[in-house]
Amino acid sequence: MVDKRESYTKEDLLASGRGELFGAKGPQLPAPNMLMMDRVVKMTETGGNFDKGYVEAELDINPDLWFFGCHFIGDPVMPGCLGLDAMWQLVGFYLGWLGSEGKGRALGVGEVKFTGQVLPTAKKVTYRIHFKRIVNRRLIMGLADGEVLVDGRLIYTASDLKVGLFQDTSAF
């Protein structure tokens, strides 16, 4: 049985990456450096824009984060794909929180819009995931819309984020 708390610490997220939070068969978050959040501050089975579930998580920004040193030299900015990946990570985390099992894989996204950037001078990135649908069949899949904010300002939106959980990924 999954401990369905409303919030999770960095240590909890690291435990997920080791397969300890949702059990050996549950989906895992990536380990650092690809883990793109420091905490989950809210998880609910209702709520969000569609009243089908909501997740909110945060990443603390500091100039020493690994991507600022290489993207780009003299013009440091967090790659937009990392914010997108964070949203996929949270969709998979939510599926594990619901008690689903399998290996998480991003399956796609409808549309992504970037209207801002994350610079090393920022303090905090906030991710908001609004669930539209959970499919519980042979393939378990989450479908959601997401938002990325930097210091409270909306900078990315993504529609139709899709993550599936697979028992066997050898043929994927």
Swiss-Prot record:
**EC number in record:** 4.2.1.59, 5.3.3.14
Q: Which InterPro entries match?
A: FabA, FabA_FabZ, HotDog_dom_sf
Q: In the UniProt entry, which residues are flagged as the active site?
A: H71
Intrachain S-S bonds = none
Xref: Pfam families: FabA
The pathway is: Lipid metabolism; fatty acid biosynthesis
Q: Which is a Gene Ontology cellular component entry for this protein?
A: cytoplasm
Claim: Magnesium is one of the keywords in the record: no
GO molecular function terms listed in the Swiss-Prot or TrEMBL record: (3R)-hydroxyacyl-[acyl-carrier-protein] dehydratase activity; trans-2-decenoyl-acyl-carrier-protein isomerase activity
Q: Name the Gene3D superfamilies for this protein.
A: Hotdog Thioesterase
Catalysed reaction equations from the record: a (3R)-hydroxyacyl-[ACP] = a (2E)-enoyl-[ACP] + H2O; (3R)-hydroxydecanoyl-[ACP] = (2E)-decenoyl-[ACP] + H2O; (2E)-decenoyl-[ACP] = (3Z)-decenoyl-[ACP]
Subcellular location(s) per record: Cytoplasm
| Keywords on record | Cytoplasm, Fatty acid biosynthesis, Fatty acid metabolism, Isomerase, Lipid biosynthesis, Lipid metabolism, Lyase
Which terms does the UniProt entry file under GO BP? unsaturated fatty acid biosynthetic process
By its UniProt entry, which HAMAP family does this protein fall under? FabA (MF_00405)
The entry's function note states: Necessary for the introduction of cis unsaturation into fatty acids. Catalyzes the dehydration of (3R)-3-hydroxydecanoyl-ACP to E-(2)-decenoyl-ACP and then its isomerization to Z-(3)-decenoyl-ACP. Can catalyze the dehydratase reaction for beta-hydroxyacyl-ACPs with saturated chain lengths up to 16:0, being most active on intermediate chain length.
* Description of how the protein assembles with itself and partners: Homodimer.
What NCBIfam families does UniProt report for this protein, alphabetically? fabA (TIGR01749), PRK05174.1 (NF003509)
Which family does the record assign? Belongs to the thioester dehydratase family. FabA subfamily.
Task: From the Swiss-Prot or TrEMBL record, give the protein name.
Answer: 3-hydroxydecanoyl-[acyl-carrier-protein] dehydratase
